[in-house]
Amino acid sequence: MNFRLGQPDILLDINDIKDLNFVSESSSSLEIGSLLTHTNAINSNLIKLFFPIISYALKYVAHQTIRNQGTIGGSIVNADPSSEWPLLISLLNAKINVRNKFKEREILVNDFFDSHFVTNIEDDEIVISVTLPKINKYCWAFEEHSSRKGDFAIVETGIILELEDNCE
């Protein structure tokens, strides 16, 4: 809305939906609720344990006030190519769980982003969570450069290398 790309007739504040603010673990994945803030993601023990690249990369998100209020769902729906979350969920082969009044569906990350600032989410849907498949053994790197600390990224890059069992 700051860029005047969207001019909604109605604006809803969904921050009070507590069911969308969580991190949970299953045997094969981590699920992150769409209303989890960047700060809560940075501080999440589960995220630090399974995906330390997230905790590391999110320290680049804007300034503390934005990290305290901005959410994973808002960041990925905005689909800003200079944002950290779209890169992270792409690297981690995420599934985005969306819902409308009638049904829930899962979108693979490669099918979620159509272009810069454009996603494959319908007008009546909201992102409810992101599912990240666990990776047994891997190494990672993330770098971001901006004009000043907290500014939009000029360039960011990341890599995840999954290691075979016999690698060290």
Annotate each PLM feature.
Residues 1-168:
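C-terminal structural segment of proteins
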